[in-house]
Amino acid sequence: AQGGVNMFLQGAIGGWIQPEGVPHTYDYANYYGSSLGKYAYELTKNKSTSKNIFFTSAKVNFPLANPSFQMLSKAGIIKRDFGKTVSSEIAYFTIGDACFATHPGESSPALSLATKSLMDNKGPKFILGLSQDALGYIVKPSFFDMSNKIPHSEYLTGMSIGPATMGIILSTLQMLIKN
């Protein structure tokens, strides 16, 4: 143990993308995790500090298109009121050259990449999924059009609050980043 302060940030967690060409074994997972830890530790040797910290956030009302969330709320399974809209929060912040954006649910790769494209910094870009909320899967609106025949779209949209979610997140982040 090296001591020090640790901070865990949930990354962009959505997407069913599995690595190809690597062993799916405990030994490989242990090797991969140990290698990542050693690399992270090496980065601390050249650390820098910054007093440049910025934070902004916005309350957002998302339209609720999935009645399942309302049923789960009425049954007491989800301890939250779901009406025609659901209120949440989105944040954007910087620490030095690093930028961070939050998504209030499980981020799809498309949402994460679109969010990173909004960030105009030269430093690292971080997407924090399931931040401030857990509004289910956040998928592209095209997933809600069943005529597109996107694999697993029926399941994915069944775990989402609705097709407007991704666009609202991106427009909110764009506003937060520009201000």
Where are these regions (language model features)?
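Non-catalytic substrate/cofactor recognition surfaces at enzyme active-site rims
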Residues: 1-179
